[in-house]
Amino acid sequence: MTVETDQETMLTHYITCALWSSMDNADESGGDPLDQNYGPDDLHPDTRAAMLADCSAFLASFESEIGGLLEQAGHDLWLTRNGHGSGFWDCGRPWSKDAAKKMTDAAHALGESDLYIGDDGLLHV
């Protein structure tokens, strides 16, 4: 695989997790998960670019720890950076304790990132 392919694979799963774990806030209860009404094509181009930059930088920093587990890394990066109660450190994950700690710390350093529906109908961070 190429670096670009690896980045896109990780990004695809990062976006999938973001849509699955984010709500549309359409009502007082939080509404529906975004993935029920939105998909990757609904991301604003700047949002996709920002997500790709985050995934690419993370992958470059932890390529040896991630290995071929790009799908899991994308998923865990979104969950961990946003404090969803699961992520790199969670039991049953394929990472060593040391790698999980390093990746968790790096994900937290990125800060939280929330998707929202803009006035243009597209998803933004």
Task: Annotate each language-model stretch with its function.
Residues L122-V125:
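C-terminal edge-of-domain segments
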Residues M1-G68:
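Long, contiguous N-terminal structural blocks used for assembly/anchoring
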Residues A53-D120:
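Amphipathic protein-protein interaction modules
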